[in-house]
Amino acid sequence: MIYPLLLSALPLLSSAALTYRGADISSLLIEEDAGISYKNLNGETQALEDILVNNGVNSIRQRVWVDPSDGSYDLDYNLKLAKRVQAAGMSIYLDLHLSDTWADPSDQTTPTGWSTTDIDTLTWQLYNYTLDVCNTFAENDIDIEIVSIGNEISSGLLWPLGKTSNYDNIAKLLHSGAWGVKDSNQATTPKIMIHLDNGWDWEEQEYFYKTVLATGSLLSTDFDLMGVSYYPFYNSEATLSALQTSLTNMQSNYDKSVVVVETNWPVSCPDPEYSFPSDLSSIPFSAAGQEEFLEKLAEVVEGVTDGLGIYYWEPAWVDNAALGSSCADNLMVDIDTDEVLESVTVFEDL
């Protein structure tokens, strides 16, 4: 049995202990087109990527949609964003949704024009897609650090063929997508990630990986990283101690590095739909609370063997401050002034 460590007993971290101190700023170009100009802590207008890198962020996550109706988050959109990210000196992590729209546990719609009836055809389409994405980035002299084959795929991917009613299909798809990345012309092969939701729920993580690897169609050598989402405002059981147990078990059972790839903490949450986890209940809903939460989360991740990093999800999406939650504001930007909050400095110490 693996016993969760007492959080209070975790050692203090040295500066910049995590490999990836990241943020997902996928909506940046859309926000700028809407007229938003971000301001640094001195109140001066500055490009968001420069504000972030100056405060310790070293990696940016970007969601990629296949063929969205309005071009949002498509390949061209992400090339524009990635060029700015790379120029600012940060690494790039592509979160491939493998859909024309949002992909998450409730919806994994196959892109228009991809097969929904033949798994062999679909695996080749996925292989060619991940190959093309990586090669297009290479042609534009953009290096990719991480590629996630799907987004929050605990319920499968590329439905209906990739539903959890057929884990062998899921395994074939993950294998095919991974090899498109491996066969690409990227100067250094990007790290390949599988990303599930509810990172605090070890039973959910264990069932998925045990089942998909048991098919034999996905090999442990096909991927490098296990990514998880960890949101404290959707379930009172999502404690830091539960997360630590889950990440520890994931790493020790599968010998993979682990990353928390989505997380948030609110500056305003007057009417939460769910109770917050017990070991987080003392943290205030404020910029100071964001710092405290991320510091505690970093302690958990750093305390796990091969715990590599944290990515804060959409800290500057001013037009969507709730970020899909019941909390009013989870941003690191003041929604009235577009100036970043003091909490942005926490990345320097993670």
Swiss-Prot record:
Gene Ontology BP, a term: cell wall organization
Signal peptide positions on this chain: 1-16
Pfam family, one: Glyco_hydro_53
InterPro entries: Glyco_hydro_53, Glycoside_hydrolase_SF
EC numbers on record: 3.2.1.89
Reactions accelerated catalytically: The enzyme specifically hydrolyzes (1->4)-beta-D-galactosidic linkages in type I arabinogalactans
GO cellular component: extracellular region
UniProt keyword terms in alphabetical order: Carbohydrate metabolism, Cell wall biogenesis/degradation, Glycoprotein, Glycosidase, Hydrolase, Polysaccharide degradation, Secreted, Signal
Glycosylation-annotated residues: N128
Protein's UniProt keywords contain Hydrolase: yes
Active site per UniProt: E152 (proton donor), E262 (nucleophile)
Gene3D superfamilies (alphabetical): Glycosidases
Full protein name: Arabinogalactan endo-beta-1,4-galactanase A
Organism: Aspergillus niger
Name of the encoding gene: galA
